[in-house]
Amino acid sequence: MLDVNFFDELRIGLATADDIRQWSHGEVKKPETINYRTLKPEKDGLFCEKIFGPQRDWECYCGKYKRVRFKGIICERCGVEVTRSKVRRERMGHIELAASVTHIWYFKGVPSRLGYLLDLAPKDLEKIIYFASYVVTSVDAEARHRDLATIENEILAEKRQSENSRDSEIEKRAGKLEADLAELEAEGAKADVRRKVKEGGEREMRQIRDRAQREIDRLDEVLDTFRKLEPKQLVTDELLYRELRDRFGEYFTGGMGAEAIKALVQNMDLDAEAESLRETIRTGKGQRKIRALKRLKVVAAFLNTSNSPLGMVLDCVPVIPPDLRPMVQLDGGRFATSDLNDLYRRVINRNNRLKRLIDLGAPEIIVNNEKRMLQEAVDALFDNGRRGRPVTGPGNRPLKSLSDMLKGKQGRFRQNLLGKRVDYSGRSVIVVGPKLKLHQCGLPKQMALELFKPFVMKRLVDLNHAQNIKSAKRMVERQRPVVWDVLEEVIGEHPVLLNRAPTLHRLGIQAFEPQLVEGKAIQIHPLVCTAFNADFDGDQMAVHVPLSAEAQAEARILMLSSNNILKPADGKPVTMPTQDMIIGLYHLTHRTPGERGEGRAFSSDAEARMAFDNGELHLQAPVKIRLRGLVGVESGPGAEPWTAPEGWVEGDPITVETTLGRVLFNETLPPGYRFVNYEIRKGQLSAIVNDLAERFPKVALAATLDGLKEAGFHWATWSGVTIGMEDVLAPPRKREILGRYEKEADRIDKQYQRGLMTAEERRGELIEIWTKATNEVAKEMDTALPQENPLWKMINSGARGNLLQLRQIAAIRGLVANPKGEIIPRPIKASYREGLSVLEYFISTHGARKGLADTALRTADSGYLTRRLVDVSQDVIIREEDCGTDRAIPMQVGQQAGEAGSLVVHEHAETSVHARTLADDIKGPDGTVVAERGADINSILVDKIVAAGVESVRVRSVLTCESKLGVCGACYGRSLPTGKTVDVGEAVGIIAAQSIGEPGTQLTMRTFHTGGVAGEDITQGLPRVQEIFEARIPKGKAPIADTPGRVRIEDGERSRKIIVVPDDGSDEIAYDKISKRVRLLANDGDHVEVGERLTVGTIDPHELLRILGPRAVQVHLTQEVQEVYRSQGVLIHDKHIEIIIRQMLKRVTVIDSGSTEFLPGVLVDRALFESENRRLVSEGGEPAAGRPVLMGITKASLATDSWLSAASFQETTRVLTDAAIHARSDSLIGLKENVIIGKLIPAGTGISKYRNVRVEPTEEAKAKVYSMTGYPETDYGFGPASGQAVPLDDFDFGSYR
């Protein structure tokens, strides 16, 4: 069997009949499967043991040889080899076909490869293959030319003979007619009878004439056809073809069906064909040139590879191993079988019948019909339903063919190769574990015992609790008390992986140290819920056990939850106290004047706590406390900065005006952090955790988070926050406010009834009035709510809910939308607290229902987007530390603020310029170097740069990276999830795809309607992101100026025309058919620059690429994607979007091939294109000319160099067809390819750089090893606890088969 680690690339090609026979272990001759009485396979049938191997290990069919000692013997009685039964998964058979058939993929695929090769239309090809028409395969033109005169004379003689016989016959008949008429006259017959006889005679003479004429015409047609006979010519008339064959059989050959196609392919001279096509491309125009290009691709594919085009016509069909198309007995004695067996059976039946008919010498028409049926049977086996109606099984279900086995989500690629099930795993419901540390999880005892069973068994034997593995297994199954102690020992320091589906980003799988718990539910630390997007309303999670030492080390170092605090999308902490913890910390740090003990002073925090315990001091009372070990005091955002008293040094005792609660809060923060002396809400807490993440090690951060969690839960209980009906306070002046606006609305209605305004204007006015009313009522509610109101506390602290929700509950529901998404101009005046009227309730249900439908659609769409993004970026891996490029991109660091124009940090600096590498030294106004080239940009450096008055800097970017494969570390910059320089081997492409796809479900699906005809609808949310990444031409696209010039606008009846008169005096450029509704951005007489938008709308990225080049498109696309995400408040770093855009712009269309091998019009990888051109220029050749192309992510994924990756993505059959013809080789660079064939992925620790590490002992270590005194006692390490792995065969796991 092949070992995956021994090959570096995987090639796919066309198999010839010899290849198929070579793979085969025997010919399948009978359609039988298994004998219904003995249940043993029939000889020569589809399950034959002689061909495919024995059904039982080491046992032949007849039972003569049993046991392993006869290994390799072939039984002389039944012919079965004595071997393992698993060979039935590997050994193939074949069916020798009585007539050739074509492979449906190459004839029916789009484009038809056979059609392109033979230059035949697919319609004609179908007629030939399915025996509806004859085709001429070859013509001996020389012989025809030589003998044409003789042949023509022969035909002429035949025609004359035919004319003579016609004339003589007519003469004879005319004589007979005259005699008959004379006889009748003599008999005195009536005129009527005479007339009838005369007419009859004339009719017969006419028939003779016609028959003779037809004969002459046919001779003319035969001669004419023969003169013009060409190879590949179709002859649809069967009689004509037979006549041709009978008369001129030695001058041409022809036929129908796959045999004829085979003959045509054999007669082809590929080199000559390629040369003539190249000539056509050089000289041709229009459609001819395009067709020649397409044909040349196919012809060149066969020329440049070892593939023979004869592989597209099959003489024998391979039969896949029987264990891959099993047949199993059901309870009722019936059998369930794979559809493939039915399809193979049809092929064998028809093939055998055809053989018999040929042997009997049946008429051609019967044989041809059987051949057609055989062709259809093979088609159905390869790709059922591709042509005509699919073959159906019982219950009219189409049978699953070989192609269907590969295609789609349930196909081989996605179901079994990319999505395997694994052992050592389990799943259960999750509950909260508030007492756990950040890196721990609670694992139910029963589950842990099952998962760690082999480890427990080995340890029981090591500790002599059991004599052997078998008795250890029995002990575990009976759950003896000692087993639990051993389990406790085994799971210590052994991390497990927890995963919650859907795993939208890498934080969906994290490692934890298991703690044994009673019950059957897994316990989860409350802070990791955000990362998993988990809640405890019945969610389930899966547990996986990393087995090997390497896997455990990776889980502990890379995946432990306390090492995954930062989110890969933006580098912000994701383990953040939420909900009740925030309420607790808010309660703890809130300051309430007038509380018990206000104004007192305490000599230490311990004294203050004592006063609190004795009930003399309130947690929130403002007091003075003398604190030790402070490094400074933080007064909070918006407050006066704290100034230290004179002479105070860090660490000296100091009296601070604060509250006891704040002192307790600061105890959870690490020593060395400034004293936090302000109220903590969600935003402030987030800023503190951010700051801690940047300045303190992970260990300190994890401990702090645990402290915050403990404090949060504890004080949330103390705060006693509850909600009752009376806490929902309605605004006192609501009636009065609504009454006032009601009058306004009546006034508008009256004006409308008098005809003073249109319905559209009335609608707009009403919406405006009621929006104002809603806002005023909401404002009134805000002012009326007391600070102590629990709802206000929840919202103000950021724990849960927002003012909009409170407004709907307590004040007024407001305006809602109808099912079309337009706003209804009458508001719902009630709040939920008061209750809605029937009509109000009815119109408010539209929005709710639409919301639910939206969410369902959005989830599917978002998942599909992620899948496409992963596919396009999966091979972007950090391959080297620095590619050494000088190219960089400029980025804004600062922006002008206010009237004075002082420079402040740019609002989007965190998601654009942070975590990147500087490309140049940055100098201040006085010429001093503020930051050196190659420095990592963080918030401290950004502040320094902005303080030096620098507004924009040049930074390295993946868009300008020059690495041959993947990208380099310097261009990528800092790794966001670790906060350190990115490691070689990091799969940054997949991280980028996950970061963009994961928030996809939060984006809206809506295209916003303001109702009526208020301009074009703008696509937003998820559909807009898809539109950008698929590089589609946007809806309502705006034209952009091709050249700088003056604008002239011409109004037509229905549309406008914008004309740009270029500055350089070249021809005017017109943009016509611009709707009158669209707002213009350039007026008559304005001057526009190149690439400037002329109307309101979205720019077409392809136009932008053509006019302004790749750099402009990159900036435009990044901004467009960011706009959508920012509008929803989602932060994603630019670098993730840039990686996807880099993949979209990876290819070049060849315009002129120069002296390269590239064909014009083909898409080529940019790196390959540039290196090939450099090589040619250095050798003095002519380089190729190309144009950059922007490809959508689906197209880019399918155009990838790896055929395995493309085939497992979409359009499997098309990708495989194409790859086979080009004999594509997959060099296994990306991740998917390696997962498919079962190798370690070339990313992370699987990259070759780390796989080939050699450990050299130091001199010191060598000295220790070689002197026996280095050992405390001589132990050769063969004892029971030597740490050696016990071979798995020794464990009796029961059968897994």
From Swiss-Prot:
Binds 1 Mg(2+) ion per subunit. Binds 2 Zn(2+) ions per subunit. It comes from the Bacteria. GO terms for cellular component: DNA-directed RNA polymerase complex. The keyword Cell membrane does not apply. Keywords: DNA-directed RNA polymerase, Magnesium, Metal-binding, Nucleotidyltransferase, Transcription, Transferase, Zinc. One of its GO terms (biological process) is DNA-templated transcription. It is an enzyme of class 2 (transferase). The keyword Transferase applies. Zn(2+) 1 binds at C60, C62, C75, C78. SMART domains: RPOLA_N. InterPro entries: DNA-dir_RpoC_beta_prime, DNA-dir_RpoC_beta_prime_bact, RNA_pol_asu, RNA_pol_N, RNA_pol_Rpb1_1, RNA_pol_Rpb1_3, RNA_pol_Rpb1_3_sf, RNA_pol_Rpb1_4. Its EC number is 2.7.7.6. Belongs to the RNA polymerase beta' chain family. This is DNA-directed RNA polymerase subunit beta'.
